[in-house]
């Protein structure tokens, strides 16, 4: 069996209009369709879906490190963080990191889904870990 790339991302939201505004303004997502309880976007070739669900627990996952990270260019990072602040986005305290691990900002959408904008790549991370994390086992 061969699995392809990610097909789509779906998030349960409590307020469709508020969430549409968030994803358009924070991510620059292009709204493709909007129904009573759903919205679909194109996010740089990723199918992003929002589905309204009112009565579900929303706070538990916020306490974990579970998140989705998107790449941003190093030269755009400060501007991206400033834009999040201007939009009133809930920015989370970041974890301490070595500069070789590049830069990140963590934030949530209106329903608490956690995201990260990160300037590094997987190769950056592996290179850093190989030089510093001698307890780790690496595979080809």
UniProtKB/Swiss-Prot annotation:
Residues bound to Mg(2+): 8, 67, 116
User: What InterPro entries does the annotation carry?
Assistant: Fosfomycin_Res_Enzymes, Glyas_Bleomycin-R_OHBP_Dase, Glyas_Fos-R_dOase_dom, Metallothiol_Trafse_FosB, VOC
Cofactor (UniProt): Mg(2+)
Q: Which Pfam families match?
A: Glyoxalase (PF00903)
Keywords of the record: Antibiotic resistance, Cytoplasm, Magnesium, Metal-binding, Transferase
Q: What is its EC number?
A: 2.5.1.-
UniProt name for this protein: Metallothiol transferase FosB
Query: Which source organism does the UniProt entry give?
Result: Geobacillus thermodenitrificans (strain NG80-2)
